[in-house]
Amino acid sequence: MKIIAVGMNYALHNKELGHTHENKEPVIFLKPDSAILKDGKPFFIPDFSNEIHYETELVVRINRLGKNIAPRFANRYYDAVTVGIDFTARDLQRKFREQGNPWELCKGFDSSAAIGTFVPVEHYKDIQNLNFNLLIDGKEVQRGCTADMLFKIDDIIAYVSRFVTLKIGDLLFTGTPVGVGPVSIGQRLQGYLEEEKLLDFYIR
C-alpha cells in the first residue's frame, strides 16, 4: 500500500504559502505506509521539528488495479472517501525548498498521514462537491470544498496512473485548502465530511 498526495491543489492555500506560480500539472509526492495514523490513535509530535502543521484533506481509497487510466473511467477505481490530515514539518519543508531537496522527510515521517473512517462514495451525490472541515479543541480552524480543487479527483488519478500503477488499498490525499496552521501537545483534532465526524484524535 502506498500513499499518494497532491500539493498546491487549492488556490487560496497556495497564496497563503506564497506560491504564485500556476502549475499546469498536479504536484505529486508520496508517503510510505508507515505514515498511516488511524483508529483514533494519538499523534506524537516528533523531536526533529518545532513547527508541525495540520493540513486537512479529502482522502480517496483506491479499490482496483489500474495503469494508464482514462479520466472518464477514473471514478471506477475508488470506492470510499474520508477526511485526513497531512501533517507537515513546515520548518523542514522551508529548509528543503531553499536547498532544492525533495519533501519526503518533512511530509512522509511516521504517523504523518492521519485518516478517519471511510464512507462509501455512493453515500454522496457528488464527491467533487463535498464540504470538509477541521476543529481543534472544538473551534473550527479549516474548511474547504472539493469543488475548489485546481485538479479534480478523476484527473489526478488518471495523471498519476501514467507513472505509477495504482493498487487496491492505495490512498490518495487530494490537497488542502486555505487555513493550515500549527498543532501543539494536548490539542484534540476532529475532522468532518459533510458535517459527519469521521476523524477524532489527540496531539501528544
Roles of regions detected by a PLM:
Residues M1-L171, G179-R204:
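Catalytic-core "active-site belt" of small-molecule-metabolizing enzymes
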Residues T176:
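Switch II (G3) loop of P-loop NTPases
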